[in-house]
Amino acid sequence: MPAFDLTAPYSPKGDQPTAIKQLVAGVNDGERYQTLLGATGTGKTFTMANVIAQTGRPALVLAHNKTLAAQLCNELREFFPNNAVEYFISYYDYYQPEAYVPVSDTYIAKTASINEEIDMLRHSATRSLFERRDVIVVASISCIYGLGIPSEYLKAAVKFEVGETLNIRGQLRELVNNQYSRNDTEIARGRFRMKGDVLEIGPAYEDRLVRVELFGDEVEAIRYVDPTTGEILQSLESINIYPAKHFVTPKDRLDTAVQAIRSELTERLDFLNTEGKLLEAQRLEQRTKYDLEMLGQVGYCNGVENYARHLAGREPGTAPECLIDYFPKDWLLIVDESHVTCSQLQAMYNGDQARKKVLIDHGFRLPSAADNRPLKGEEFWEKAHQTVFVSATPGNWELEVSGDEVAQQVIRPTGVLDPIVEVRPTTGQVDDLLGEIRDRASKQQRVLVTTLTKRMAEDLTDYLAENEVRVRYLHSEIHSIERIEIIQDLRLGEYDVLVGVNLLREGLDLPEVSLVAILDADKEGFLRAERSLIQTIGRAARHVEGVALLYADNMTDSMAKAISETERRRTIQQAYNEKHGIVPTAAGKKASNSILSFLELSRKLKTEGPDADLVQVASKAVEALDDDADGMALDALPELIDQLEMKMKEAAKKLDFEEAANLRDRIKQLRQKLVGKV
């Protein structure tokens, strides 16, 4: 029996069955690298889901940013409602790494804010990998950073079993050793309390409580309990409580690590003094001895991750354990948007080492701090036994290592063809474009325009606005939430044209866009390379009347290749449609997803007014806060804060952490208003 239960209202169509069959056969035959070359709108995620389901392998789906990871996770959870689809990204809301700027003699201490909801999801991912095989973890590049030793994490788990006789004091001590804190007043994640014969634990990976009921020293019952209502949700025969932190260091290993750090410090001080670097030596000695004192007394210090190599007992230069090491041996890696993601893997290591070298050279850290690092590219690929690369424009390296194992997915189940590509001269390009925009706007269609520079984009936006075109400008200084709202407004018809420098961002799947205009298409460079052009042209590939206009005076190699590839895909789709009698139909994709739900709710409130429920009123307060916060009644603020907190938690559960962070900031503002009015 397969481990995964794929649920979908449709079956594979077009190129999907062939691609799925080829990829599944490759995985089963032990092929190390394969590539799914899938055009925009061909259902690559559904193909990925089928490959996972038919191979039955625990899978890691790697994305190059957390927004794309959240979208993939939401889609895969819809396909696999009965399996464990987990989300693993960096748990920092804010992160400023430790750094030193020699030129200005400026030391920047590490500052960070941890998102507890994301931390819970990370723990949930590793717990699932220990307890079941039907696991899909959707992760960002942060999964290549150190994550403790899986065997130590598993060994440290505290087990409870019905009918078992316990040494309850010993069990409580183990929970404390696993970094759970006792709080008999308020129970929460990472805490426990003991009242009479009832032990309640807030696991690091659950939003439910675990209640262990005792009769004397015997476990009488184990239950999952709702933390708010106290309602019994489920009875269990046994349970493992995993540590509250992934980094678990037994006492004997901690003692050994402290000795190793002392030894390295002595050696490094000798070197610095010999080199005449007396200031650096003094700085290093003072900082490290303080850290050693903290480690010896409480087992922790600020910046403890810099001693990770010693705490893990690793040899110098060896790779750290990371999320990959929690997977069983037969796991499957799927790299989404591989043309971007693969290049990021090596870049993460290089950037980390450059910063650490400065800290080490100037006496802020021991040389072993360099081993607190992400995996190198080659280390990552050594750990990845079987890989499927997924991209509309796979990179040369992916295609090279895949060899003949490339599955083509060009045909769209909707029958929609790739855009018609036209090349027009640059003379009079703006006026020509204006006419095309007016034509599309009259048909309730949308337009994307990409320029080479920010200045060009600004000037074009101003010109179009002066000519009564409803236009917006998308640029790098716009924050994530506002960026999402701009894209949402385009889809909803609040305006007709979106202008930007680089509109290749993943997630820009806009079925309403029928025209993509690329200005200065013949200016060779990153933004006008073959892959970039194909990606940009593909933004119009979801519309039945899709057209891409390339304004250029010369035909570059990149343009020729991009046009040729688009025409090839268009010809294949056309032949398929004629053979099967398919009439192209636009994908009926709604202008909403988990990331945009809050924005939709805000719009709804503008028309519903006082008839909206409390949660909606709270959301409206967010919209009005900057303009009318001073006019709010004092007694209304606490209720609004409560409702916003509920909304924030709902957003986090939907993996919409950008919305959650926005709500968190608004709550903070409301609290400040409340304090100021009391």
Swiss-Prot record:
Motif (Beta-hairpin) on chain: 91-114
Limits of the Helicase C-terminal domain: 429-591
CDD domains assigned to the protein according to its UniProt record, in alphabetical order: DEXHc_UvrB, SF2_C_UvrB
Alphabetically ordered keywords of this record: ATP-binding, Cytoplasm, DNA damage, DNA excision, DNA repair, Excision nuclease, Helicase, Hydrolase, Nucleotide-binding, SOS response
Domain spans labelled UVR: 638-673
GO cellular component: cytoplasm; excinuclease repair complex
Binding partners and assembly: Forms a heterotetramer with UvrA during the search for lesions. Interacts with UvrC in an incision complex.
Role according to the record: The UvrABC repair system catalyzes the recognition and processing of DNA lesions. A damage recognition complex composed of 2 UvrA and 2 UvrB subunits scans DNA for abnormalities. Upon binding of the UvrA(2)B(2) complex to a putative damaged site, the DNA wraps around one UvrB monomer. DNA wrap is dependent on ATP binding by UvrB and probably causes local melting of the DNA helix, facilitating insertion of UvrB beta-hairpin between the DNA strands. Then UvrB probes one DNA strand for the presence of a lesion.
Protein name in UniProt: UvrABC system protein B
UniProt lineage: Bacteria, Bacillati, Cyanobacteriota, Cyanophyceae, Synechococcales
Encoding gene per record: uvrB
